[in-house]
UniProtKB/Swiss-Prot annotation:
Residues 238-293, 331-356, 406-455, 904-966, 1356-1399 are annotated as: Disordered. PROSITE patterns: HTH_CENPB, ZINC_FINGER_C2H2_1, ZINC_FINGER_C2H2_2. Pfam families: DDE_1, HTH_Tnp_Tc5, zf-C2H2_Z280C_D, zf-POGZ. The keyword Cell division applies. Residues 806-846 are annotated as: Required for interaction with CBX5. There is a cross-link at residues 319, 356, 419, 446, 486, 626, 674, 797, 879 (Glycyl lysine isopeptide (Lys-Gly) (interchain with G-Cter in SUMO2)). This is Pogo transposable element with ZNF domain. Residues 1011-1081 form the HTH CENPB-type domain. Residues 239-266, 410-439 have a biased composition (Low complexity). It comes from Mus musculus. InterPro entries: DDE_SF_endonuclease_dom, Homeodomain-like_sf, HTH_CenpB_DNA-bd_dom, Snail/Krueppel_Znf, Znf_C2H2_sf, Znf_C2H2_type. Plays a role in mitotic cell cycle progression and is involved in kinetochore assembly and mitotic sister chromatid cohesion. Probably through its association with CBX5 plays a role in mitotic chromosome segregation by regulating aurora kinase B/AURKB activation and AURKB and CBX5 dissociation from chromosome arms. Promotes the repair of DNA double-strand breaks through the homologous recombination pathway. Residues 1336-1364 form a coiled coil. GO terms for biological process: cell division; double-strand break repair via homologous recombination; kinetochore assembly; mitotic sister chromatid cohesion.
């Protein structure tokens, strides 16, 4: 037994109510969970020992007789009937076998050392026993068995020597210590197998057998240490019947699938009878007759309970032992007889016989006729809910079929009598009122092959890790909250009066104040853990805690619930057993009831799901507030010393009642682990802290003979049996099917990419990873999965066992356009998209693929017969690598370009792939992160070469050698294209020093290759929509969307929704194009928004148009307002170069100035308000259409809205005596109480545009706002070139900006029709016919408006290039289509070697990049 194992047992009391097989649960059976704290597991093997024991001569009982005798203990009685000593023995026999065979197996039970038991007593009398016998003719049998001795106090067995018959040996001598409760034991030996069946009751404790004489040994394995981490106890008995006898029958009687604990108890009836009372029935007609199966050696099934008396009943114990030696019913019987404290007589026969039991005690079936069975694995369930939950995991496709028309209740149950394969194998069954047919445990549709079911009698075992058993998470109502639009609420800090834009920033700001106090010395923070907020006595203890608990490396001795580390795994397991419950989730989000066993998951959940809401989360006790002042006061009170820490988790509370309520409500099992759902009671569950094999406890030669050592080793080696999803019969069928596949020739495994020389060895069985949802039949793929994903080490030690990928093979999903060459990537895609049924195998890189019609390639399956005649060359090594789990993403382009270009060779130097594929080191990422291709690793991978080059046919000649290289862009080019999509083509050209036409050409090439090369939808559809919504919201707030921020957000969403995914530039470019996220799209109103964003937009349009109609609002009272923030980099402005980059419209800090634009639905442009951070005394030339406000400290969002309402809006509404409507976004502080009060005072109805919808339904975003920003950019760049060497400060720049704003506002003000049509395009106003225009019509209008305004502002030349970049042209100019490879061939082919040597590699690199 390993010190790192924790044995659990799936018992009836621990199951959910719908999982219980029996509908009636007696109160006396229910146990306290804490009653398993002091138990141990003992594994015992019957071995020959050098001590003889005389075996009593058994009397023969002949004739047809059925007897039932009940004798209860006549000693001192205890009020608790469950503590009385009661032994129930039931034996049934048939006409062909004896009730007692020669050399039977007696069971000797003692409680105190009787005086007469110095040597084995042969003829005592049994008092507390009930015997049910059904004997027929007595015949002799050569089968011998072993006696079993169970004692409670030092039972002295002397002169224990083998008898003359070598087959009759001592079986077991167990010693139960005084004062300990005894768990009922069920012993079921079967030929050549092991059987373990503890029943429901109190735990059992066995101690080491104390020898009477020095040197004598007992076959009981001693405990090697005093620390035990195993519960509850199990007892394993092995039979010593020769294999020649056990093989006489093909099917071994077994009751492993029928739990004894679920049978109705009859113990109360037996124990309640007066002492000595007997009930005899001698009607020979009730004796059934059974066929004669071959004789097997079995042991009687005995339930022993601890009596309430000790020394004075030693005579009774002696009588008990003597009677056990004389009662004939203790001999052999043709089938195992089960007797326990809560079950009646049961008899199980093999599939080839039918059984009838006659008894005066009620007899129950092993399973009733109402059971439901799984149609795939034949697992049996009593209630439909349990079967449905099992089928959702076992056979989900059948569940879908059931939902379409067939009910689960119509599932056929197990037949009571299976159809026989031959008439000789089934005996006639006489139906009587007292007989109950016992159906076969599995339908005997096919006789199993020899030795295939050798291990079927082994009891069900399940091996689980601590993470699976104790930890879990529950989604709560988080999914329901995602449909509601998020509205950011600003909070003002009471310490520094700073206003934070949303709740998460306010929470971080409060933590920052505490850190400042600690740095200033106001609060002692040298002994406070900044992760779990615990107080330590010394800094050294804090340092040890940080290294052991909060390090990034996984540890098998760290409790993730309470975040404590332990010295060893046994101590850790003991802590888990004593402190925590299975499925305990004490950390709860009070907003949506999301809960988890890990604090970090709840914290990440709140920051992601409840961002931009009014909720504030206390990091100390997870209490949620809606008021900023209350949150601040509560937060600061946690900094005091008098807080109440929970000793079962990391939370701390301000009041004792909160702590008590927390412990009562949350420190209990919230939901049982999914692996335990549907398990039968009695299943042995082994809990392990680590993933390694359990260590074998050595047994010295002085404690046990050599035979015992071998048996103990055999038992230990069979302990960690894997969990199979199919029953043994079905596994054997699968193995036979795999063996038949070997005749198909040599094949290649799609999972590990290796050839399959031997199918049975390569696909040994279907295994399921206990740590995740990974399942496979490939042994190499399973080993690689465990090495890469579940081996806790600080640095990668082993390379992956995968090859690069199968050459020429590609997998295409039959339900969508997803295609990949990595089998695991396709498996993950199918898992995350359950509606996608299957995938097809396609050849990749073949010349005829480009001539197939759309959809034709997905229907054609690759023929492996082509392998001998057509072999594609090996592929380029994978560009595999991904983001680190801590959130490290590729750096900014300017930081990466230098070292990457220096470290990477040129494209021409990597035209020939290496002969041996390189294997990338596995990173500490989720499984999907290390799979696939085309991901950037700037430290190892080649960025200049194409990511994947499609292989060309070997016989294709050299004419088309350059075609495949043009299919996909290199990583360098993809980075440039991604930059252009995040910003614009002009900025990308300036940043990477590439012509804009070349960037647009790369973009067109990438768009053209999308139809044939859809290699990477790495995120699910739901995750991509969430990421697209984030991009739209970032753009609305003028926050940066670049390579770094995009990859960081994608990683965060991928980890939270899917457990991780891989990142590549190709995926990023496709994502931006797939969701139309280019910043300067001219038909944005026709693009599809994410699902719930589009729903919010529809609700907004419906609300606005209904209010306009109901309130009869005039067009002059419908206003749209939006802000434009300008960011100034003063350092760049004062420098001599790059001055054009000083003024930006995207940034994260405080804006240099804010421009508030406002337009009316009748085409009027209201005065524009400009807020400048600084002094504006010298500015006298301010245009009439602009109002300037200046202050050194700047203006807050509330102040901006207040000044705009006072200086602009109230002046406009003063002469209008009508209600009005204000269209604005939900960002900044537009929804604060102050702003809403201002609007209410002016009778203005706020129409708030939902987050992410501004590009489609905000009138200013449709045309005007983007044009104003482009015009300012153009003017400043022209001015920066003119004053490159001249000095320029912010005051001069402000004067220029005011002039440019006046110019652009004048143009807009002269085009009232353009302004009015902006409201129509945004669907704020209905169309001329009263209905909303179609998206296509609105897109045409938007494109026309943008073109008209740009033409007036002379922006059409530059923006036409932008437009050409977003839409591919049908035919490009010859200058743009010329490639460096073609020029290289041209000059080298037509020039003399002496006169021209071709281009240098560096020149080619510059031409391409």
């Amino acid at each position: 037994m390993a010190d790192t194992d924790l044995f659990m047992e799936c018992e009836e009391e621990e199951l959910e109510p719908w999982q219980k097989i029996s509908d009636v649960i007696e109160d006396s059976v229910v146990e306290d969970y804490n009653s398993v704290d002091k138990t141990t597991s003992v594994s015992v093997s019957q071995q020959p020992v050098s001590a003889p024991v005389p075996i009593a001569a058994h009397a023969s009982v002949a004739g047809h007789l059925s007897t039932s005798t009940t004798v209860s203990n006549s000693g001192a009685q205890n009020s608790d009937s469950t503590k009385k000593t009661l032994v129930t023995l039931i034996a049934n026999n048939n006409a062909g076998n004896t009730l007692v065979q020669q050399g039977g197996q007696p069971l000797i039970l003692t409680q105190n050392p009787a005086p007469g038991l110095g040597t084995m007593v042969t003829q005592p009398v049994l008092r507390p026993v009930q015997v049910m016998q059904n004997a027929n003719h007595v015949t002799s049998s050569p089968v011998a068995s072993q006696p079993i001795f169970i004692t409670t106090q030092g039972f002295p067995v002397r002169n224990v020597r083998p008898v003359q018959n070598a087959m009759n040996q001592v079986g077991i001598v167990l010693n139960v210590q005084q004062g300990q409760t005894v768990r009922p034991i069920t012993l079921v030996p079967a030929p050549g197998t092991q059987f373990v069946k503890p029943t429901v009751g109190v735990p059992q404790v066995f101690s080491q057998m104390t020898p009477v004489r020095p040197g004598s040994t007992m076959p009981v394995r001693p405990t090697t240490n005093t620390f035990t981490t195993v519960i509850p106890a199990t007892l394993t008995i092995r039979s010593t019947v020769p294999q020649s006898q056990s093989q006489q029958t093909k099917s071994t009687p077994s009751t492993s699938t029928t739990p004894t604990a679920t049978q109705p108890t009859s113990l109360g009836q037996l124990a309640g009878q007066p002492p000595g009372q007997s009930n005899q029935t001698s009607n020979p007609k009730l004796a059934p007759s059974f066929p004669s199966p071959p004789a097997v050696s079995i042991a009687s099934f005995v339930t022993v309970k601890r009596p309430g008396v000790t020394g004075e009943n030693s005579n009774e114990v002696a009588k008990l032992v003597n009677t056990l030696n004389t009662v004939p019913s203790l001999g052999q019987s043709p089938g195992p007889v089960v007797v326990s404290n809560n079950s009646s007589a049961q008899r199980t026969s093999g599939p080839e016989s039918s059984v009838k039991v006659t008894s005066s005690i009620p007899v129950f079936d092993l399973q009733d006729g109402g059971r439901k069975i799984c149609p795939r694995c034949n697992a049996q369930f009593r209630v439909t809910e349990a079967l449905r939950g099992h089928m959702c995991y076992c056979c989900p496709e059948m569940v879908e079929y059931q939902k379409k028309g067939k009910s689960l209740d119509a599932e056929p149950s197990v037949p009571s009598a299976a159809k026989p394969s031959s008439p000789e194998k089934t005996a006639p069954v006489t139906s009587t009122p007292s007989s109950t047919p016992i159906p076969a445990l599995s339908p005997p549709t096919k006789v199993p092959e020899p030795n295939e079911n050798a291990g079927d009698a082994v009891q069900t075992k399940l091996i689980m890790l601590v993470d699976d058993f104790y930890y879990g998470r529950d989604g709560g109502k988080a999914a329901q909250l995602t449909s509601f639009p998020k509205v950011a609420t600003s909070f003002r800090c009471p310490h520094c009066t700073k206003r934070l834009k949303n709740n998460i920033r306010f929470m971080n700001h409060m933590k920052h104040h505490v850190e400042l106090d600690q740095q200033n010395g106001e609060v002692d923070g040298h002994t406070i853990c900044q992760h779990c907020y615990r107080q330590f006595s010394t800094p050294f203890q804090l340092q040890c805690h940080l290294e052991n608990v909060h390090s990034p490396y996984e540890s098998t001795t760290k409790c993730k619930i309470c975040e404590w580390a332990f010295e060893s795994e046994p101590l850790f397991l003991q802590h888990m057993k004593d402190t925590h419950k299975p499925g305990e989730m004490p950390y709860v989000c009070q907003v949506c009831q999301y809960r988890s066993s890990l604090y970090s998951e709840v914290d990440v959940h709140f920051r992601m799901i409840h961002e931009d809401t009014r909720h504030l989360l206390c990091p100390y006790c997870l209490k949620v507030f809606k008021n900023g002042n209350a949150f601040q006061q509560h937060y600061m009170r946690h900094q005091k010393r008098n807080v109440y820490h929970c000793n079962k988790c990391r939370l701390q509370f301000l009041f004792a009642k909160d702590k008590i309520e927390h412990k009562l409500q949350h420190h209990k099992t919230f939901r049982k682990p999914k692996q335990l759902e549907g398990l039968k009671p009695g299943t042995k569950v082994t809990i392990r802290a680590s993933r390694g094999q359990p260590r074998t406890v050595p047994v010295s030669s002085n404690d046990a003979p050599s035979g015992t050592l071998q048996e103990a080793a055999a038992l230990t080696s069979t302990d960690p049996l894997p969990v199979f999803l199919y029953p043994p019969v079905q596994r054997n069928i699968q193995k036979r099917a795999v063996r038949k596949m070997s005749v198909m020739g040599r094949q290649t495994c799609l999972e590990c990419s290796f050839e399959i020389p031997d199918f049975p060895n390569h696909f040994p069985t279907y295994v399921h990873c206990s740590l995740c949802r990974y399942s496979t039949c490939c042994s190499r793929a399973y080993a690689n999965h465990m090495i890469n994903n579940h081996v806790p080490r600080k640095s990668p030690k082993y390379l992956a066992l995968f090859k690069n990928s199968v050459s020429g093979i590609k997998l295409a999903c039959t339900s969508c356009t997803f295609a990949t060459s990595v089998g695991d990537a396709m498996a993950k895609h199918l898992v995350f998209n359950p509606s996608h049924r299957s995938s097809n195998i396609l050849p990749r890189g073949l010349s005829w693929m480009s001539h197939l019609r759309p959809g034709q390639a997905s229907e054609r399956v690759f023929d492996w017969s082509m392998k001998n005649t057509y072999l594609p060359p090996p592929l380029v090594p994978n560009k595999a690598a991904t983001v680190k789990p801590v959130g490290v993403t590729p750096a900014e382009p300017q930081e990466l370009a230098g070292p990457v270009l220096q470290a990477l060779p040129s494209p021409a130097s990597t035209a020939t792939p290496p002969a041996t594929p390189t294997h990338p080191q596995p990173s500490a990422l989720p499984p999907s992160a290390t799979e696939g291709t085309e991901c950037l690793n700037v430290s190892e991978q080649e960025e200049g070469s194409p990511v994947t080059q499609d292989p060309e046919p070997a016989s294709g000649g050299g004419g088309g050698s350059g075609v495949g290289k043009k299919e996909q862009l290199s990583v360098k080019k993809l980075r440039v294209v991604l930059f252009a999509l995040c910003c614009n083509t002009e900025q990308a050209a300036e940043h990477f020093r590439n012509p804009q036409r070349r960037i647009r050409r790369w973009l067109r090439r990438f768009q053209a290759s999308q139809g044939e090369n859809l290699e990477g939808k790495y995120l699910s559809f739901e995750a991509e929509e969430k990421l697209a919504e984030w991009v739209l919201i970032q753009r609305e707030q003028q926050l940066p969307v670049n390579e770094e921020t995009l990859f960081q957000k994608a990683t965060k969403i991928g980890r939270s929704l899917e457990g991780g995914f891989k990142i590549s530039y190709e995926w990023a470019v496709r994502f931006m194009l797939r969701h139309h996220l280019t910043p300067h799209a001219r038909r944005a109103v026709a693009h599809t928004l994410p699902k719930h964003v589009a729903e919010n937009a529809g609700l907004f349009i419906e609300f606005v148009q209904r209010q306009i109609h109901n309130q009869d609002l005039p067009l002059s009272m419908i206003v749209a307002i939006d802000e434009i923030s300008l960011f100034l980099d003063t350092e760049v402005l004062s420098s001599d170069d790059r001055k054009e980059n000083a003024l930006q419209t995207v940034g994260t800090g405080e804006p240099w100035c804010d421009v508030v634009l406002a337009i009316l639905a009748d085409g009027t442009v209201l005065p524009t308000l400009v807020f400048f951070r600084g002094q504006a005394n010298r500015f006298a030339n301010v245009p009439d259409s602009i109002l300037l406000e200046a202050k050194d400290s700047g203006y807050s969002d509330d102040e901006i809205m207040e000044l705009w309402s006072t200086r602009v809006w109230k002046k406009h509404t003063a002469c209008q005596h009508s209600k009005s409507m204000l269209v604005m976004d939900c960002h900044r502080t537009h929804l604060s109480e102050e702003v809403l009060a201002l609007l209410s005072a002016s009778s203005t109805l706020p129409a708030v545009v939902p987050a992410g919808c501004s590009s489609k339904i905000q009138p200013l975003d449709v045309c005007i706002k983007r044009t104003v920003k482009n015009f300012l950019h153009k003017k400043w760049k022209e001015q920066a070139r003119e004053m490159a060497d001249a000095a320029c400060d912010s005051d001069v720049l402000l004067q220029l900006v005011l002039v440019w704003l006046g110019e652009v506002l004048g143009v807009i003000g002269d085009s009232p029709e353009l302004v009015q049509r902006s409201f129509l395009v945004a669907s704020v106003l209905p169309g001329p016919d009263g209905n909303v225009n179609s998206p296509t019509r609105n897109a045409d209008m938007q494109e026309e408006l943008i073109a008209s305004l740009e033409e007036q502002l002379k922006l059409n030349g530059e923006q036409s290039e932008e437009h050409s970049a977003s839409a591919p042209r049908p035919r490009s100019s010859p200058e743009e289509t010329v490639e460096p490879e073609s020029l290289h061939q041209l000059f080298e082919g037509e020039s003399e070697t002496e006169s021209f040597y071709g281009f240098e590699e560096a020149d080619l690199d510059l031409m391409e990049i």
